[in-house]
Amino acid sequence: MKPFFWRIIGSGSVNLVFIHGWGLNSCIWNNIIIILSNYFKLHLVDLPGYGKNILYKEYSFSKITEIIACKSPKKSILIGWSLGGLIATNISIVYPEKFKGLIIVSSSPCFCEKKDWPGIKKEILNNFSFQLKNDFHNTVKKFFNIQFLGTKKNNNEIKKLKNIFFRQKEPSYKTLSSGLKILKNIDIRNYLKYIKIPTLRIYGNLDVIVPVKIIPIIKKLQNFNINKNIIIPSASHAPFLSHPFLFCKIIKYFIKKFN
């Protein structure tokens, strides 16, 4: 199998491992790399089937968890956005000794709506899966549009996402479909209690994919003393794109507090 590509930028003593979301690749972090690489060593992951790992055909949630955990430096800090946040959460549960911090961005331990749990309606995810097969490009564009509903910078941010998606070789239908299955089926809420490392969760107050009303529920599920939640006003599902400087300031402050 082709070696797993892993981009490293910066030379700080603290290692940050970045995991992107559905449909995109590690270029999604370009806005903040310029800032954070002055302070930390950044490890930028392309998930299997995406970006530079487009030929790496490994789609199971458990295998992706294993690949990233094994490749990560010891005592690094995981940063995961959306689908990447779900993967980062699982890594910190399965490999509790390897990491010293967890930063979750606009993500949920269960993306699908359940009883007493806010999330995406199952029929919407099913519909996306169906449309993906029949109209690949428009379905991806539609998903990007949903991520920025209500934000003032709507058009600029959507354009950035589309540029990242179409700049490199497109992920296959199988890659995107497998990612949607993870979003639809994975539920690790009951395992949050096993996370015993400092955790920061960043949300956008306008996010319709991961609504801020999950915050008090997650607080009860992950009852650990260093568990910080921050809501960025006027931000939606990708706050690091709409508010890069504030986002980096939050991350630097969090790491400084416990490092």
From Swiss-Prot:
E.C. designation(s): 3.1.1.85
Localization in the cell: Cytoplasm
EC class of the enzyme, as a word: hydrolase
Signal peptide: none
Boundaries of every AB hydrolase-1 domain copy: 16-244
GO terms assigned for molecular function: pimelyl-[acyl-carrier protein] methyl ester esterase activity
Superkingdom of source: Bacteria
Functional pathway: Cofactor biosynthesis; biotin biosynthesis
InterPro entries registered for this protein in UniProt: AB_hydrolase_1 (IPR000073), AB_hydrolase_fold (IPR029058), AB_hydrolase_sf (IPR050266), BioH (IPR010076)
GO cellular component, one term: membrane
Catalytic reaction list: 6-carboxyhexanoyl-[ACP] methyl ester + H2O = 6-carboxyhexanoyl-[ACP] + methanol + H(+)
GO terms of biological process kind: biotin biosynthetic process
Catalytic machinery residues: S82 (nucleophile), D207, H237
First-listed, main subcellular location of the protein, grouped into a coarse class: cytoplasm
Keywords: Biotin biosynthesis, Cytoplasm, Hydrolase, Serine esterase
Gene3D superfamilies named among the record's database cross-references: alpha/beta hydrolase
Residues holding substrate: W22, S82, L83, F143, F144, N145, I146, Q147, H237
Function according to Swiss-Prot or TrEMBL: The physiological role of BioH is to remove the methyl group introduced by BioC when the pimeloyl moiety is complete. It allows to synthesize pimeloyl-ACP via the fatty acid synthetic pathway through the hydrolysis of the ester bonds of pimeloyl-ACP esters.
Complex and partners: Monomer.
Entries under NCBIfam families matching the protein: bioH
HAMAP family: Carboxylester (MF_01260)
Family: Belongs to the AB hydrolase superfamily. Carboxylesterase BioH family.
Full protein name: Pimeloyl-[acyl-carrier protein] methyl ester esterase
